[in-house]
C-alpha cells in the first residue's frame, strides 16, 4: 500500500505542478491583453448609448489601420454627467486614475484643469493644415482641440458636439513617450482631421 502511494505521490505532485504552471501562464497571457488605446468621454452633451457601444470596434479598426497590426485592442468608456461641475470632477478622477490615454470632454472642464502639463502638447499631433479652435495654457502651449462639426463625434452619437474638446494624456517611460501615448496621438490626429476628410 505504501509502495503504491509512494509511486502515485510523484504523479500527483507532477500533476499539481503542471496545473499551477498552466494557471500562471494563462494569467500572464490574459493580463498582457490590455488595451493598446483607452479613450474616455465625459460630457453633459447628449450621448446615444448604442452608438457609443459601437465606438470600440470602430476605434479598433482605426488602430489596426494606423499601426498595420490586426491584434490591436481599444477600450472606450463614457460618462454622461448632469452638470459642468460633475464633468470636471469626473475628468479629474479619470486623469488621476492613469487608466486613459485620450480624453474627450466639455470645454469648460478642460479650462478648469489646473495642471495643464498632464496633457501632451496638441501641436505635436494636429495636422498642420487644419484650422481648429484650441485651448492654450498660460505659456501659449496647446493642450486641447475642438471637435466642432466633427464627423466622428456625430458618428459616436454625440449630437451636440460644439463644445467638445479632445486631449491626449502624457505617459512616458524613461523620458520617452509610451506606445499607448503614441497611439493616442495618432488616433487623435485622425479624429481631429475627420470633419469630412476621414469618416469611420
Describe the residue ranges of each PLM region.
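Extracellular/periplasmic juxtamembrane helices and adjacent flexible linkers that interface
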Residues: 15, 172-200
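Early extracytoplasmic/lumenal segment of secretory-pathway proteins
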Residues: 33, 41-107
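A structural signal for short loop-to-beta-strand junctions that line the ligand-binding cleft
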Residues: 92, 123-176
Amino acid at each position: 500500500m505504501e509502495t503504491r502511494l509512494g509511486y502515485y505521490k510523484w504523479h500527483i505532485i507532477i500533476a499539481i505542478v503542471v496545473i499551477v504552471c498552466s494557471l500562471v501562464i494563462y494569467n500572464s497571457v490574459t493580463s498582457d491583453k490590455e488595451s493598446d488605446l483607452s479613450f474616455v468621454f465625459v460630457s453633459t452633451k447628449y450621448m446615444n448609448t448604442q452608438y457609443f457601444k459601437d465606438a470600440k470596434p470602430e476605434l479598433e479598426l482605426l488602430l489596426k489601420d494606423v499601426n498595420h497590426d490586426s491584434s490591436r485592442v481599444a477600450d472606450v468608456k463614457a460618462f454622461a454627467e448632469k452638470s459642468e461641475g460633475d464633468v470636471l470632477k469626473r475628468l479629474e478622477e479619470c486623469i488621476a486614475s492613469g487608466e486613459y490615454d485620450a480624453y474627450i470632454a466639455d470645454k469648460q472642464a478642460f479650462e478648469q484643469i489646473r495642471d495643464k502639463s498632464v496633457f501632451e502638447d496638441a501641436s505635436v499631433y494636429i495636422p498642420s493644415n487644419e484650422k481648429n479652435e484650441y485651448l492654450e495654457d498660460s505659456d501659449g502651449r496647446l493642450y486641447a482641440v475642438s471637435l466642432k462639426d466633427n464627423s466622428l463625434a456625430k458618428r459616436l452619437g454625440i449630437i451636440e458636439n460644439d463644445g467638445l474638446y479632445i486631449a491626449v494624456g502624457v505617459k512616458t517611460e524613461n523620458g520617452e513617450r509610451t506606445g499607448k501615448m503614441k497611439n493616442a496621438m495618432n488616433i487623435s490626429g485622425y479624429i481631429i482631421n475627420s470633419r469630412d476628410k476621414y469618416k469611420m
